[in-house]
Amino acid sequence: MEHGKSSALPQGLLVGLVGLAGALGLGVVLPINLRNADSQTNQNLDIKSSAATTATQQRIEKLKASMLKTWQQEAKAKGLSYVVPPSLQGVVINQATLSPSQKIIALTFDDGPWKDTTVQVLDILKQNNIKGTFFVVGRNLKLYPQLAQRVVTEGHAIGNHTWNHFYHYMNPQAAAFEINSTNDLIYQVTGVKTTLFRPPGGMMHNGLVAYAKNQKYSVVMWSSDSIDYNRPAVPRLVGNVMKFARPGGIVLMHDGGGNRTNTVKALPQIINNFKKQGYRFVTIPELLEMQGKNQKVIATKKPK
């Protein structure tokens, strides 16, 4: 009996060891397989997530394109093309010739759209229920198209201020690029066709104005310069504007092109000063329309 007992122990031990080894082997294999399965699942999820993101981006782009198309159609339907009287096409305009009793003034803003300042200017104009005119730079419009859309949707006028805001002399081809590229983008972004042009720096003899006049643009200058590009103190800036204010006047300010903090601070005071003097605010197209009507009245009064 002792012999049988002693020979049975090793077999039991052997069975136990085999079982333990099997269990250990299974324990080693299972985590590896599970990890592989998890990795495969994560890869599948990543692929699905990436595909979903791409699909979402495509839907967003389609929606944006659809919204832009709808906006352009609505803009055209609303007649957002500034019809300038024939007598004021292809000419330089510093101000409208109105009677002293016609207390009308046009606020204009150059060099935008600008990330922060344009928004602040638009907010101030909206608070005061005033419409202005914005002469945009093409390369800035490309960066902030949504600001130009806001300009137009809130009832302001928009004009061309070239693509690069260069001052140097340009041949007709270069001038055409500067003006046409900007006008094309204005139309693409807002649906507006504008024939309002303002030369950078008021430069009259570097090729831009000659091209613009040849293309029947109204070259819109100004009669009252804020000189805000020199960043004067707010009281001086306000004084610069009011000094030459007159009925039919055009005020030059800037919403872009640099630090326009003082312009934003001065704008409410400028508006209040004009209101106290009985002025009403109009856009450049409205001002030119009034000028055109006045010219017709004068013409009909001339002796035959």
Tell where the protein language model's regions lie, with residue ranges:
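A SAM-dependent methyltransferase catalytic signature shared across enzymes that methylate proteins
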Residues: S218, Q277-Y279
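Metal-dependent polysaccharide deacetylase catalytic core of the NodB/CE4 family, i.e.
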Residues: Q102-I105, K115, K126-G258
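N-terminal pre-catalytic segment of deacetylase/amide-hydrolase enzymes
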Residues: E2-L107, W114-V121, Q127, I270, ...
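Hydrophobic alpha-helix-in-membranes signature
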Residues: L30, R198-P199, L267
